[in-house]
């Protein structure tokens, strides 16, 4: 019993270095240095908000998974794309990268301790470096290289192993430290300050955590919906997947071992029966917010009761609760979500919308709501006015900040902006109002070019109309325009019940397909 209790004590050892939330606040503020307008006036509310993002439960889960598995470090490379399973397939590789990134962030904090600057947000508490490494006080003589940032002086294996001996005194996890040794033995240049400072902008712990959990949640949703529609999926995999499209549909189609069976009649019967039992689940996510629209069937509650809610509680550690005061204040008014208007209007069909914000551990249940198929034109014009592309009345103006670019870059910026808007709102019932947005972007582009060359709009139009001709939507009905957008979707018949299909457009996610 003593051996077992001692073993459990080692497994449940406290990791003060990784649970130190002040350390993660410092790291995250340093990574978001460019996004902070007033560095000296960091409010306490912002620190609390950052603290919620980098919650220690994520690191606790990381450590728990490290102890359960045996990891093999295969060098710094991209995720393998030859695996067949899509459900948590990058799990082992993720934890290897996490260990590397966490340790490098620790080293970076040490190196910058002696380089304090005025109003440096990276250092909120000016204390000794022992605040990050409390166990170094016992071996301070042997850790002079670490304190002065001269870790590159570890020329011998004895000095290199001594660093991990100090870590082991506090962490007491052999598998964790062995993995660290393998990482730095294969890439010892990671211990050099110059190399690390050059690569630091590529290593963002919070963004890496956030993207992984988003992909993990997407995989979880897809996995259980495919499991729910198992019969229809086995009969006709391609049609079953196309009936509910998700963020990683292309990856799913490549990774799943599909059984090639062509039984169209049975597939049609299976789809009809399963839709009547489980309903339709439409999943939309952009950045850290996601939305699920459900046309509930007879047994749709099983999916939520035993899958999604359990996943949020056990995997992410988020308590599933209701904010009654927030619901009462929001229920009687319309609001925008992901660029679409959520209308407070009772619908005949049993249609529910559930929205979750990753910044707050609350799930909101909205009953009797529906997604409006009309594009919020005035809100979109307001956003364009914030970007200084037009005024509040929708009159186009020039963008002086973009006049420093060359002509090709200016045209590409406006072309990509119009392309993204067309794709995102292509299924709206008032898609004819897209002509207003097209007009604003077209003349704003011309005015920007005229402002750059100090010429009139007429002469600028004559010179650049071959390159920046945003043709009318009517002329582009059956063919692509200069913006390389398939405008066929703009003229499809608007359905009463539609599905938002997601596609990656540059760095953002856009919904561009609406099907029944």
Curated annotation (Swiss-Prot):
Name of a matching Pfam family: MatK_N
Record localization: Plastid, Chloroplast
Swiss-Prot/TrEMBL keywords: Chloroplast, mRNA processing, Plastid, RNA-binding, tRNA processing
Gene Ontology terms for molecular function: RNA binding
GO CC term (a single one): chloroplast
Domain of life where this protein originates: Eukaryota
Family recorded in the similarity comment: Belongs to the intron maturase 2 family. MatK subfamily.
Function per UniProt: Usually encoded in the trnK tRNA gene intron. Probably assists in splicing its own and other chloroplast group II introns.
Name this protein carries in UniProt: Maturase K
Species this protein is from: Chara connivens (Convergent stonewort)
Taxonomic lineage of the native organism: Eukaryota, Viridiplantae, Streptophyta, Charophyceae, Charales
């Amino acid at each position: 019993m003593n051996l077992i209790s001692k073993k459990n004590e080692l497994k449940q050892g406290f990791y003060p270095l990784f649970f130190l939330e002040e350390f993660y606040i410092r790291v995250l503020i340093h990574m978001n240095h460019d996004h902070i307008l007033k560095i000296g006036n960091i409010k306490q509310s912002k620190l609390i908000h950052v603290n919620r993002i980098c919650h220690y439960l994520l690191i606790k889960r990381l450590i728990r998974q490290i102890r359960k598995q045996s990891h093999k470090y295969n060098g710094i490379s991209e995720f393998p794309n030859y695996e067949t399973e899509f459900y948590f397939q990058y799990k082992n590789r993720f934890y290897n990268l996490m260990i590397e990134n966490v340790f490098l962030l620790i080293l970076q904090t040490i190196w910058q301790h002696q380089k304090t600057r005025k109003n440096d947000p990276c250092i909120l508490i000016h204390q000794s470096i022992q605040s990050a490494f409390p166990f170094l006080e016992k071996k301070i003589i042997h850790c002079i290289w670490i304190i002065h940032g001269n870790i590159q002086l570890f020329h011998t294996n004895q000095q290199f192993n001594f660093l991990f001996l100090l870590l082991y005194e506090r962490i007491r996890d052999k598998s964790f430290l062995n993995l660290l040794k393998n990482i730095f033995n294969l890439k010892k240049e990671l211990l050099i300050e110059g190399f690390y400072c050059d690569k630091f902008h590529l290593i963002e712990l919070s963004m890496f955590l956030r993207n992984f959990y988003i992909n993990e949640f997407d995989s979880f949703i897809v996995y259980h919906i495919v499991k729910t529609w198992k019969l229809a999926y086995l009969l006709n995999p391609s049609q079953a997947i196309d009936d509910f499209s998700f963020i990683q549909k292309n990856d799913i189609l490549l990774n799943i071992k599909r059984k090639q069976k062509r039984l169209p009649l049975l597939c049609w019967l299976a789809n009809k029966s399963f839709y009547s039992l489980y309903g339709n689940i439409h999943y939309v996510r952009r950045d850290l917010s996601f939305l699920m629209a459900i046309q509930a069937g007879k047994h749709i509650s099983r999916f939520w009761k035993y899958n999604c809610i359990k996943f949020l509680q056990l995997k992410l550690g988020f308590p599933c609760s209701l904010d009654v005061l927030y619901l009462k204040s929001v229920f009687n008014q319309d609001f925008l979500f992901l660029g679409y208007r959520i209308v407070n209007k009772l619908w005949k069909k049993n249609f529910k919308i559930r929205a979750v914000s990753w910044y707050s551990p609350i799930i909101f249940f909205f009953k009797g709501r529906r997604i409006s198929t009309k594009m919020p034109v005035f809100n979109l014009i307001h956003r364009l006015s914030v970007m200084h592309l037009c005024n509040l009345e929708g009159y186009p103006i020039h963008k002086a900040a973009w006049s420093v670019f060359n002509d090709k870059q200016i045209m590409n910026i406006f072309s990509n902006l119009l392309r993204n808007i067309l794709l995102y709102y292509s299924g709206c019932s008032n898609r004819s109002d897209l002509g207003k947005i097209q007009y604003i972007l077209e003349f704003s582009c011309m005015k920007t070019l005229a402002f750059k060359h100090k010429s009139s709009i007429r002469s600028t139009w004559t010179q650049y109309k071959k390159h920046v001709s945003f043709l009318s939507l009517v002329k582009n009905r059956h063919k692509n325009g200069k913006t390389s957008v398939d405008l066929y979707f703009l003229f499809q018949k608007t359905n009463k019940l539609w599905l938002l299909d997601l596609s990656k457009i540059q760095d953002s996610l856009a919904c561009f397909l609406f099907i029944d």
